[in-house]
């Protein structure tokens, strides 16, 4: 059975590695670095959904049953010191409870208003009676009251026992740790010293130990004693929580070793003071330990961008600050509510965000879809660390190499230049000198002719990309419109031109003038002929517009008849 479980664990680990490798292969980091986009290797994602609860009951004053009152004066002075620390904390807790408790206006038979606790606070959220801070505090206080009976029993038992540490469980299985860190010292050191060294010497040793304990108490729990809100527990406090052995966390919390490292590294184990007992000098803390769940096959990459040159102009690619990639998804990541450890991002919910399609294709290596903006000032970064070396825009910057400050001349066909320990040990960019890592290496992707997407203004990514897409559409439409106009201009060019129309108009005017002149000439000619023959006789040989009518059967018969008459 054990062998089978080990095999299953090995297969699961192998699948996790394969998924992580596939996800990391989605983003061509070397290719993007050639246009100034720097993407790191990425970290895994863990969701902190639920938490485990623990309670710590600190007994700050040891139980002393010494003969002749040895050490009583030192204990009184120590209690006075504790009062100055604990009284403000107790008053703040009383104020918190007074603010959270909501008075019910419903009167009882004795006309005395009843007091309701946590449920009334939750019920009045919509009415704005309780603030969110009060609700949060109310939840913690309600949980404390649920465990109050168990904690009270532990307090009672602590006053009757001489054990320094007791680990119990309440009714719901939550652990309650009772700490009496001074009790072992009293039992093992002070009591034997009374018979050997005398009462005065033993009292002095007790006073020194009480002072030392107060200092250690402030070191371990000082941040928690300074407020009634949640504060991260220190490693010293965690050690006391797990019986002075922090490795026991692995066995008492239902989580893995990597998760424990993450919550400790990010200080996500929170402690809240929920009770102060000035009679017994006991302080109760509620401890919440988050339970992490890793999302398989997901990486969150940190992305940044520097300027690069293309065709003699300086440009800048707009990318989201964080990229989330999984096998079937590539988008942005909102890590505002997340915390970052060395190996992972811990988030309260899935931080995935949608990004435009053009930006997805850009991140996947299609540089023609990358949204860019033209650089007009020096605010845009000019260099960044990548693969242990430096990637820099040495056309827009002054770059030097080596201890001799040799100037670097960047090929104008390349967007950026890669500088490593092998080709340039001491790197200088605009007067800033940097030493490259000896393990750094050059980018493996060959430089090609770079083409980029539309130019946009630097503003929220989604708006800019939509504007850029609209600009592309308008430009394409304008080009098609010009083609259509050109085609139309080729159709019927000889009569659609302006010169042709003018020529036609001139010809028509000339023809009209000629006709008018001919009519005038004919009219004047006829008039002159009539004036030259006043009797109305017109010679036969003279040309006239009147028709000469002759009979078709006789030759001159009509004229003869006319002469007889």
Swiss-Prot record:
It comes from the Viruses. Pfam families: Fusion_gly. Disulfide bonds join 70-199, 338-347, 362-370, 394-399, 401-424. The chain crosses the membrane at residues 501-521. GO terms for biological process: fusion of virus membrane with host plasma membrane; symbiont entry into host cell. Residues 117-141 are annotated as: Fusion peptide. Changing residue 97 to R: In strain: Isolate MVC11 and Isolate vaccinal MVCES1. GO terms for cellular component: host cell plasma membrane; membrane; viral envelope; virion membrane. Residues 522-565 are cytoplasmic. Residues 269-307 are annotated as: Leucine-zipper. Its main location: virion. Glycans are attached at residues 104, 245, 449. It is found in: Virion membrane; Host cell membrane. InterPro entries: Fusion_F0_Paramyxovir (IPR000776). In natural infection, inactive F0 is matured into F1 and F2 outside the cell by one or more trypsin-like, arginine-specific endoprotease secreted by the bronchial epithelial cells. One identified protease that may be involved in this process is tryptase Clara. Unlike most paramyxoviruses, Sendai F0 processing occurs on the cell surface and induces a conformational change in the protein that unmasks the fusion peptide. F0 maturation is a primary determinant for organ tropism and pathogenicity. N-glycosylated; glycans consist of a mixture of high mannose-type oligosaccharides and of complex-type oligosaccharides. Glycosylation at Asn-245 is essential for membrane localization and F0 cleavage. The record marks 116-117 as: Cleavage. It is a single-pass type I membrane protein; Single-pass membrane protein. Residues 1-25 form the signal peptide. Residues 142-170, 466-491 form a coiled coil. Belongs to the paramyxoviruses fusion glycoprotein family. The cytoplasmic region mediates the interaction with HN and M proteins. Sendai virus or recombinant F protein are widely used in cellular biology to fuse cells. Homotrimer of disulfide-linked F1-F2. Interacts with HN and M proteins. This is Fusion glycoprotein F0. It comes from Sendai virus (strain Ohita) (SeV). The gene is F.
């Amino acid at each position: 059975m054990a062998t089978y479980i080990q095999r299953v664990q090995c297969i699961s680990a192998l699948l996790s590695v394969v998924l992580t490798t596939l996800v990391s292969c989605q983003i061509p980091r070397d290719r993007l670095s050639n246009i100034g986009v720097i993407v790191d290797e990425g970290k895994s994602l863990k969701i902190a959904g639920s938490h485990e609860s623990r309670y710590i009951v600190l007994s700050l004053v040891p139980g002393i049953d010494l003969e002749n009152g040895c050490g009583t004066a030192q204990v009184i002075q120590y209690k006075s010191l504790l009062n100055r620390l604990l009284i403000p904390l107790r008053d703040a807790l009383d104020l918190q409870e007074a603010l959270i408790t909501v008075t019910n206006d419903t009167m009882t038979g004795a006309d005395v208003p009843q007091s309701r606790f946590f449920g009334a606070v939750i019920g009045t959220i919509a009415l704005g009676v309780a603030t969110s801070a009060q609700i949060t505090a109310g939840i913690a206080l309600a949980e404390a009251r649920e465990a109050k009976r168990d904690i009270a029993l532990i307090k009672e038992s602590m006053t009757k026992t001489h054990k320094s540490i007791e680990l119990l469980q309440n009714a719901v299985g939550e652990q309650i740790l009772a700490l009496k860190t001074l009790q072992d010292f009293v039992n093992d050191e002070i009591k034997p010293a009374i018979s050997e060294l005398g009462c005065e010497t033993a009292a002095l040793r007790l006073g020194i130990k009480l002072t030392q304990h107060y200092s250690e108490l402030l070191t371990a729990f000082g941040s928690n004693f300074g407020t009634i809100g949640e504060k991260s527990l220190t490693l010293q406090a965690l050690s006391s929580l797990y019986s002075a052995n922090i490795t026991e966390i692995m066995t008492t919390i239902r989580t893995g070793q990597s998760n424990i490292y993450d919550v400790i590294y990010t200080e996500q184990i929170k402690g809240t003071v929920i009770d102060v007992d000035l009679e017994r000098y006991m302080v109760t803390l509620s401890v919440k330990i988050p339970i992490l769940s890793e999302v398989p096959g997901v990486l969150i990459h940190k992305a940044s961008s520097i300027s690069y040159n293309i065709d003699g102009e300086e440009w800048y690619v707009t990318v989201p600050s964080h990229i989330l990639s999984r096998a079937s998804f590539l988008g942005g990541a909102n890590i505002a509510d997340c915390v970052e450890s060395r190996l992972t991002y811990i988030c309260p919910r899935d931080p995935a965000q949608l990004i435009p399609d053009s930006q997805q294709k850009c991140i996947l290596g299609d540089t023609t879809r990358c949204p860019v903006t033209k650089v007009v000032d020096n605010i845009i970064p000019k260099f960044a660390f990548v693969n242990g070396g430096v990637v820099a825009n040495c056309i827009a910057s002054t770059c030097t190499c080596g201890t001799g400050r040799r100037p670097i001349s960047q090929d104008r066909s390349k967007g950026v230049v890669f500088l490593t320990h092998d080709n340039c040990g001491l790197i200088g960019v605009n007067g800033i000198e940097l030493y490259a890592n000896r393990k750094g290496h050059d980018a493996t992707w060959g430089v090609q002719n770079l083409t980029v997407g539309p130019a946009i203004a630097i503003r929220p990514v989604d708006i800019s990309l939509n504007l850029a897409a609209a600009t592309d559409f308008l430009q394409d439409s304008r080009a098609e419109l010009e083609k259509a106009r050109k085609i139309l201009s080729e159709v019927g060019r000889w009569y659609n031109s302006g010169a042709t129309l003018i020529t036609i108009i001139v010809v028509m005017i000339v023809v009209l003038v000629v006709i008018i002149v001919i009519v005038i000439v004919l009219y004047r000619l006829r008039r002159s002929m009539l004036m030259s023959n006043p009797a109305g006789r017109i010679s036969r040989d003279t040309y006239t517009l009147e028709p000469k009518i002759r009979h078709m059967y006789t030759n001159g018969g009509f004229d003869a008849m006319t002469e007889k008459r």
